[in-house]
Amino acid sequence: LNMRKIKYVGFDMDHTLIRYNSQAFEGLAHQHLLKRLVNERGYPEKILKLPFDFNSVIRGLVIDSAKGNLLKVSRHGAIRVSHHGTKRIDYRQQQKDYHGTYVDLSDKNFVAVDTAFSLSVAILFGQLVDVKDATPEHKMPDYPQLLSDIIEVMDLSHRDDSLKSIV
């Protein structure tokens, strides 16, 4: 690489200069997102009581926004484990739902959970799928809209510094 014409070099310094307490931050984000969903999007107040469980998801998951599922997949798209909301899907049902054990990760319905700061999004999506399925009387949005609402309030919380100002 010829760097003679390069004037500036940037570095991604996350986890280099600072050690994050991801569990504490994600827990805070979870509560903050719940409040915004209730106050700004009209979600039922019942969701404010949803507990945060840091160990319920891991990085490397894929959210299937069309079906309300969380998938652990290989880099080749092979489904290893799947959950509908927070409930595990058995292998036979998984094969039926996905017509085998592979998914096309370029499909617009699949959203990767690929950073430590997206864990609260995945946790909350799983929980809201459970609430939607268990309480149809609440008239919650469909699965794609649930995910869209969660991502939008997360992005807004980062843009307006409302989340960081709490820290």
Where are the predicted features?
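HAD-like aspartate-dependent phosphatase fold
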Residues: L1-V167
